């Protein structure tokens, strides 16, 4: 796919070497720009519980998370997953970032969201996220597009099959298998409306687990793309013009919504969401105004709307849910570059209720403090 690819065939013989009981743990975290960082360390035995994982640290001045004169930021493990690249007993460790004074780093939004989910545990809130993304080559051209030109207009690419309709299916398939190996609740993939735009779905996941699994899924996608020599973009409108943007549609349900008669609770939730539209939009991704225009299967950012089977609405109720009278709803406003902890957290806050020691809007504002 590109001359700038990793020599994975050469690497294979080293991956088969005996590690003599040692385990490699790749710690991953979210930096100040909402990007992923990682570094590896050696552990002396197989890990059975997250409590066995040591805390670690990194240079926060190099990631925009701390000043140079006080640069140590601490990594507190919160979950771990089988590593599909190193395999064996090797693991990927998802970690929260903490300051040396014992407070969560201002880019650590997981900590605040977790408070809400714990407080509303009885609601048994489920999420499913539809992560759209676009693939580029190393020269920042959309992968597979004519150099200096454009492909045919949108139409044949969504869920397309065949050369000229889909690009980089090998990347997508490799990522799918990597997610399954890691134990993520990846529920599907499909080619999207714009050529070289794809989507993977994760969920249903309960509470804070949703954000965890989406971040790990993104990490795996970037790592797979490295090996194929392509770049992954989560920008919500990577190309101007008559091309679809990229979102992260968020499917939501509580226990009450999933039971017979649940439509009543779905409608109540939508009413609550309508009253906090502006607050939600602030947390629904940067540059989202380029995507939420009322065109290309989006609602206008300026207004809130809902409807059955309406992909031009802010909130969509699936036709099957409307017919059966219970199930879930889809919030179509979130952009592809969201922090899932902010989005799932504020949705929980809005439909289940605010709590005294957590506020997702204020949590987001901490970034600029």
UniProtKB/Swiss-Prot annotation:
<dbReference type="Pfam" id="PF00120">
    <property type="entry name" value="Gln-synt_C"/>
</dbReference>
<dbReference type="InterPro" id="IPR008147">
    <property type="entry name" value="Gln_synt_N"/>
</dbReference>
<keyword id="KW-0963">Cytoplasm</keyword>
<dbReference type="GO" id="GO:0019676">
    <property type="term" value="P:ammonia assimilation cycle"/>
</dbReference>
<dbReference type="InterPro" id="IPR014746">
    <property type="entry name" value="Gln_synth/guanido_kin_cat_dom"/>
</dbReference>
<feature type="domain" description="GS catalytic">
    <location>
        <begin position="109"/>
        <end position="369"/>
    </location>
</feature>
<feature type="domain" description="GS beta-grasp">
    <location>
        <begin position="23"/>
        <end position="102"/>
    </location>
</feature>
<dbReference type="GO" id="GO:0006542">
    <property type="term" value="P:glutamine biosynthetic process"/>
</dbReference>
<dbReference type="GO" id="GO:0005524">
    <property type="term" value="F:ATP binding"/>
</dbReference>
<comment type="similarity">
    <text>Belongs to the glutamine synthetase family.</text>
</comment>
<dbReference type="GO" id="GO:0034399">
    <property type="term" value="C:nuclear periphery"/>
</dbReference>
<keyword id="KW-0067">ATP-binding</keyword>
<dbReference type="InterPro" id="IPR050292">
    <property type="entry name" value="Glutamine_Synthetase"/>
</dbReference>
<dbReference type="InterPro" id="IPR027302">
    <property type="entry name" value="Gln_synth_N_conserv_site"/>
</dbReference>
<dbReference type="InterPro" id="IPR027303">
    <property type="entry name" value="Gln_synth_gly_rich_site"/>
</dbReference>
<comment type="subunit">
    <text>Homooctamer.</text>
</comment>
<dbReference type="InterPro" id="IPR008146">
    <property type="entry name" value="Gln_synth_cat_dom"/>
</dbReference>
<protein>
    <recommendedName>
        <fullName>Glutamine synthetase</fullName>
        <ecNumber>6.3.1.2</ecNumber>
    </recommendedName>
</protein>
<dbReference type="Pfam" id="PF03951">
    <property type="entry name" value="Gln-synt_N"/>
</dbReference>
<dbReference type="InterPro" id="IPR036651">
    <property type="entry name" value="Gln_synt_N_sf"/>
</dbReference>
<keyword id="KW-0547">Nucleotide-binding</keyword>
<dbReference type="GO" id="GO:0004356">
    <property type="term" value="F:glutamine synthetase activity"/>
</dbReference>
<keyword id="KW-0436">Ligase</keyword>
<dbReference type="GO" id="GO:0005737">
    <property type="term" value="C:cytoplasm"/>
</dbReference>
């Amino acid at each position: 796919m590109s001359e700038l690819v990793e020599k994975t065939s050469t690497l294979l013989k080293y991956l088969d070497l005996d590690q003599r009981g040692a385990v490699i743990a790749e710690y991953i975290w979210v930096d100040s720009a909402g990007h992923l960082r990682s570094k590896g360390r050696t552990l002396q035995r197989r890990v059975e519980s997250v409590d066995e994982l040591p805390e670690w640290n990194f240079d926060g001045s190099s990631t925009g998370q701390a000043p140079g004169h006080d640069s140590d930021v601490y990594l507190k493990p919160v979950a771990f997953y089988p590593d599909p690249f190193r395999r064996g007993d090797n693991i990927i460790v998802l970690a929260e970032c903490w300051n040396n004074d014992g407070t969560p780093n201002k880019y650590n939004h997981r900590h605040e969201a977790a408070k809400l989910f714990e407080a509303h545990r009885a609601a048994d809130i489920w999420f499913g996220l539809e992560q759209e993304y676009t693939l580029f080559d190393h020269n920042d051209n959309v992968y597979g597009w004519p150099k200096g030109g454009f492909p045919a207009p949108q139409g044949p690419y969504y869920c397309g099959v065949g050369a000229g309709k889909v690009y980089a299916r090998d990347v997508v398939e490799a990522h799918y298998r990597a997610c399954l190996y890691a134990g993520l609740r990846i529920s599907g993939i499909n080619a999207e409306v714009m050529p070289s735009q794809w989507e993977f779905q994760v969920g249903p996941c309960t509470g804070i687990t949703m954000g965890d699994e989406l971040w790990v899924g993104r990490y795996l996608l970037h790592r797979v793309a490295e090996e194929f020599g392509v770049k992954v973009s989560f920008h919500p409108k990577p190309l101007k013009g008559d091309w679809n943007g990229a979102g992260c549609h968020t499917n939501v349900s509580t226990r009450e919504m999933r039971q017979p008669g649940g439509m009543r609770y779905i409608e109540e939730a939508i009413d609550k969401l309508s009253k906090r539209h502006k607050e939600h939009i602030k947390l629904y991704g940067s540059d989202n105004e380029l995507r939420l225009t009322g065109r290309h299967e989006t609602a206008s950012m300026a207004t809130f709307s809902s409807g059955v089977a309406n992909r031009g609405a802010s909130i969509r109720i699936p036709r099957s849910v409307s017919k059966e009278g219970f199930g879930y709803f889809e919030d179509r406003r979130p952009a592809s570059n969201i922090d899932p902890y902010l989005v799932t957290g504020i949705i929980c806050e809005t439909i289940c209720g605010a709590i005294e020691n957590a506020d997702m809007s204020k949590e987001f504002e901490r970034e600029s403090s």
